[in-house]
Amino acid sequence: MTLWDLTQGASAKVSRFKADIENGYRTRLSELGFHPGEQIACVLSPRMGAPKLYLVNNTVYSLDDSIASLIEVA
């Protein structure tokens, strides 16, 4: 399952990044707290494919499907 698959109110731990993620994205996401073992919650999942809001370390980030689908969670 990917981060994009999380529904509003659900949470999961990051398990890994997909192999095809660009190094720049991997580095920046890790700096923001999206790293393996980190608990992440989906706080808002708007309709029509709009970016979702995720809570990581008391900070809320907006990610669209092209990025959130590269982060695998369990």
Question: Which stretches of residues belong to each language-model region?
Answer:
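C-terminal structural segments of small proteins and small subunits
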Residues: 12, 46-74
